[in-house]
Amino acid sequence: MNPSNDHIDISKESTQTNKLHFAARNRIEELRETINYHNRLYYERNSPIITDEAWDALFDELKQLEIKHQEFLTDDSPTQQVGLPPRKPFSVIEHRIPMLSLSNAFDADGIRTWHKKTAELTRRNNFAMVTEPKIDGLAISLIYENGELARASTRGDGTHGEDVTENVRTITSVPKYLAKNSPNTLEVRGEIYMSRDGFDRLNTEIEENNLILQRSGQKAKRLFANPRNAAAGAVRQLDPAVTASRPLAISVYQLAWADETVPSTHWKTLKWL
């Protein structure tokens, strides 16, 4: 055995490890910056420039790198955040229970991993599951007091959301009053969305108005990129009249809390809602 050769081999291995370590840190920083940029476009401006699939790929790559290199994981990483803080034009509402976002499973392996974790958490190998359509819109919290809609807020950063009560009151499909046998106080959560037909009609109206604007030498308005952006932008308008003019609907999928006894399972809750 040649000690000098051993020293050279160890040095080479150490150098290679340092290079990989440095490359991982740089990639993590790059991914965080990129994801934060696209989050601002998505949440604040409602104008994303990449697809949900592309964003998911970036997010998943960052998450895997942080799992592999936990020394680089920090509290301000996008993987540790939910949404963005509320914008200043709206007053802030603190969520009684945090509004969290959903995780994704892209393939059969992802579903099996989720199933295994759920079985471990519940300590049950066999359990019933409820499957629901994922409607892509704006997550909303509705609080009812004495049977009347009292507050509506966005998810925001998961802990604090924007008070959009006046805007949400203009949406015809959002119940303003509940049945007399409802709990005195409760919070439900759901998604405010725009149907594909409504989205197409809205963009057609914008195109027609743009022709008039262009004839008078005024700047044309941008079309909406997708129904999700159109719905989110409509709810977060400073003028409730604009919200009222948009073809919005709501799908309620969760009872967050109530001051009375409520159904014991999610399936029973959905039927009750």
Labelled PLM ranges:
Residues 2-273:
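RNA/tRNA-interacting regions in translation and RNA-turnover enzymes
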